[in-house]
């Protein structure tokens, strides 16, 4: 075929692609569609978004276009929701119409399919309801909200304190130990066992989980999801998600070993055994979501979502304690101290721990009601850390209206949770560490309506009760046994952040001195 023959063919292909592009963006011309930057042909707004720091990019776009603005990511229409009013209206008031998830073809390489979508990314329908109901009831049966699970967490907190004590007051980075402790709680729930902190397979699993979450952001990943044909190119999606793929392979080994110890005649000891029991009951039902492929996805969801978010929050908590010694210890800060000044802080974590719990008895969830200052500090750590700035994407299942704008069926929705947690109209000091956000004038704990670190609505994080328990028991146990400080002669760490899918504190070291 000569070049002369290729020219008409190229023109036909170009015209076809332009028509497809116009077909996907025609809704932008509809009345009351949210405003946004002008999309480029084919690419849409892919080049307008900094996927390495999406929250900052969205903040700039919000300043230009308002709380509800639109994007076109290749052929995918997207609406970004900012501020408490828009997020609550979409996720709560119109929750039934916004509870779906958009297609995610990139995850097919991980084994995602019609009957194996896990819980977090599952389409809104019978399979999601089945798995959500199963997860909630199983966690409750395993002791969530009861003394049995609380005992698992307090035992792990004791192991974590022992590992901190092994540092003998020397400077160290706490992140790795925090990851191990939180992951062991998830391992106990899902596999009925805990790992030693130096177990090679355990360390490998944690490394893969950390690297896998980093794959949740980036330009190429967004392109693969926005153009459905691209994930079918051999090895392309596998390369982008290679750490998540390796993580699931490692998880498969643990699940295979666990199956060998499962006795169907005995009550389930953990979530995996409860899932296998459901799978046996569902034999012969082709529509059931209880199958081997979905087991690995469900357990993987719990590991990835439950481990890194909680451990990152604890890492923020310890950093903020060494930067705000008055909040940690409840003492007057010397006039020359650069931390907060010369006032006596009304929030004193260790003083409250000593008054309510003492330094011998282990903390219990029952103590929380009598510890408003500590509870306020933990919530302010979540508020200030703002570790999940963007919620998991939603999709409209019918035409809806939000804040006066018309959003068509099939539109991807992104909730900018950071815009709610940093809303200057709601928070007195949104960009400063200020535990008083969660205390009233009488010193009682209060939770502002704009505190939404776990999102809101039908797809709000199902692990929120577990996360609250872990944060309170781990944080109080550590502050009960140790005083934390910057190592002598080292520069004071900063509040600076590393932004990816999660927002983590910049690497820092601390000293844990037994009290």
Swiss-Prot record:
Stretches in topological domain Extracellular: 1-2, 323-515
Q: Which domain of life is it from?
A: Eukaryota
Catalytic reaction annotation: an organic molecule + reduced [NADPH--hemoprotein reductase] + O2 = an alcohol + oxidized [NADPH--hemoprotein reductase] + H2O + H(+)
- Report TM segments: 3-23, 302-322
Transmembrane in keyword set: yes
Q: Which InterPro entries match?
A: Cyt_P450, Cyt_P450_CS, Cyt_P450_E_grp-I, Cyt_P450_E_grp-I_CYP2D-like, Cyt_P450_sf, Cytochrome_P450_fam2
A cellular component term from Gene Ontology for this protein is: intracellular membrane-bounded organelle
- Glycosylated positions are 416
Localization in the cell: Membrane; Cytoplasm; Mitochondrion
* Record-given protein name: Cytochrome P450 2D7
């Amino acid at each position: 075929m000569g070049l002369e023959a290729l020219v008409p063919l190229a023109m036909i292909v170009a015209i076809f692609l332009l028509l497809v592009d116009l077909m996907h963006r025609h809704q932008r011309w509809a009345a009351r569609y949210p405003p946004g930057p002008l999309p480029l042909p084919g690419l849409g707004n892919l080049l307008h978004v900094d996927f390495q720091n999406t929250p900052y990019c969205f903040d700039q776009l919000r300043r230009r276009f308002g709380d509800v603005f639109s994007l076109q990511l290749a052929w995918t229409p997207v609406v970004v929701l900012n501020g408490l009013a828009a997020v609550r209206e979409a996720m709560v008031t119109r929750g039934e119409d916004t509870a779906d998830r958009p297609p995610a073809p990139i995850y097919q390489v991980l084994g995602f399919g019609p009957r194996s979508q896990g819980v977090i990314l599952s389409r809104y329908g019978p399979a999601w309801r089945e798995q959500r109901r199963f997860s909630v009831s199983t966690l409750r049966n395993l002791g969530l909200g009861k003394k049995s699970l609380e005992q698992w967490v307090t035992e792990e907190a004791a192991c974590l304190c022992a590992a901190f004590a092994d540092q003998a007051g020397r400077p160290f980075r706490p992140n790795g130990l925090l990851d191990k402790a939180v992951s062991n709680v998830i391992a106990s729930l899902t596999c009925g066992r805990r790992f030693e902190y130096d177990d090679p397979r355990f360390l490998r699993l944690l490394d893969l989980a950390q690297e896998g979450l980093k794959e949740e952001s980036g330009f190429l990943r967004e392109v693969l999801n926005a153009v459905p044909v691209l994930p079918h190119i051999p090895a392309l999606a596998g390369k982008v998600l290679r750490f998540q793929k390796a993580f699931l392979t490692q998880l498969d080994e643990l699940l295979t070993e666990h199956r060998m110890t499962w006795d169907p005649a005995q009550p389930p000891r953990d979530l995996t055994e409860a899932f296998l029991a459901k799978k046996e009951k569902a034999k012969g039902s082709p529509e059931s979501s209880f199958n081997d492929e979905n087991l690995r996805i469900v357990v993987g969801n719990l590991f990835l979502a439950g481990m890194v978010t909680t451990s990152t929050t604890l890492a923020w908590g310890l950093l903020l304690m060494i930067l705000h010694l008055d909040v940690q210890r409840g003492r007057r800060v010397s006039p020359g101290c650069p931390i907060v000044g010369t006032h006596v802080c009304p929030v004193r974590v260790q003083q409250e721990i000593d008054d309510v719990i003492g330094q011998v008895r282990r903390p219990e969830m029952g103590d929380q009601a009598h510890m408003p200052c500590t509870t306020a500090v933990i919530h302010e750590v979540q508020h200030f850390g703002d570790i999940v700035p963007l919620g998991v994407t939603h999709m409209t299942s019918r035409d809806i209206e939000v804040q006066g704008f018309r959003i068509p069926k099939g539109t991807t929705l992104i909730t900018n949770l950071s815009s709610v947690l940093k809303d200057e109209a709601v928070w007195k000091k949104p960009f400063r560490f200020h535990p008083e956000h969660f205390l009233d004038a009488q010193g009682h704990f209060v939770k502002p309506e704009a505190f939404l670190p776990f999102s809101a609505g039908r797809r709000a994080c199902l692990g929120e009760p577990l996360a609250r328990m872990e944060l309170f028991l781990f944080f109080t146990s550590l502050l009960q046994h140790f005083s934390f400080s910057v190592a002598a002669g080292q520069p004071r760490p900063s509040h600076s952040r590393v932004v990816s899918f999660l927002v983590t504190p910049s690497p820092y070291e601390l000293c844990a001195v037994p009290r």
